[in-house]
Amino acid sequence: LHTAKLELYIWTGVYADRAATDKRYTLTKEEIGGNNFVTYELSKLIRDYMITEYNNYSTDSLWVDAVVEIRDSNNAIVQVGGLNTTTSTYLAIDGYGYFEDGANPRSTEYTTPMLLQNNTTVYYSDGQDIRIPVYAEAATVTATLSPTVTDIDVKWNLADIFWQAGSNTWNGGNSNLSVIDSGNSDQKIQYLIIIGTQDLVDNSTLTLSSNNSSYSTNTVITLTKVCEPKYTPLSIIFYNKYGALQNMWFFKKSTTDINITSEKFKNNMIDFDNSGGTPSYALTKHQEKKFVANGKESITINSGFYDESFNEVVRQMLLSEQVWIYDGSSTLPINLKSNTLQFKKSVNDKLISYTISFEYAFDKINNII
């Protein structure tokens, strides 16, 4: 090996949809020091095409073909398996592993769990929708609610996007749902959405089972209702380590602060025109004038009591590069303001709650257009 040329194709839809226009990068590298190999970092290139505009569209997964051509020191093609090029195909999802997990803990389809979140207890605000990410690539997944509820009370369905609005035409909660992947990249991550939760029995369970032997153990999720009569519950939405959108409710007190920035200059206050030619000035005029004023608001929120397993959920929230806050009527982008957090343990703290500060990801005065 002397040089290796990489042609990287990235696209959405079904795998067969790949076109010549989907070639996003062509890169050539030479071996160094007779190592007889070269290395390409694909993930950073692919991430450029992972795009989310909340309430509009999202690209949670992509098809990727890495086509490699090898040449020797005479610039002649080195065939591999009788072929001039070799193609490696990937389904790319914008997740991550921890250092202690080793290299790429999601290297095969069956190492990705059916439930694309770590917590198997979901605390939800009474009457608000429940949204749970499910992996649909590896096998057909069946979702079952227990105890059963009449279809006029609770509805549920699957959606390709997290923010899909509910509908009264959806399946009743007394019927099972099948999570099926048709091969489209948009359906690899699906969201199980439950509406009408005011009629859902507290601590109902949602069971995910699969027809694939690689998922021999069912996943049981407990749905715990929280009724908060005093404060307005806030939902924090974020991308978790599996590359799926997830939300966590903060039920208790929240406070909002604003930080103002501006420039100042000394104003010329002398007035000849309105004082009969005698130099004068108005006492109501600003000698020190402020301009280019704007503000950034921040919010500090409190979760209420959670079980210790939510330490991992909060960790992923704090590590997320895209976070939003939902107050029951609108969704706005936010960035983490608290850069440190002490994780709590029930053996030490008895009751576990979280207080986190975020900054709204925009200036208060619109200066875009």
Regions found by a protein language model. Name each.
Residues 1-227:
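Preference for solvent-exposed, low-hydrophobicity sequence contexts
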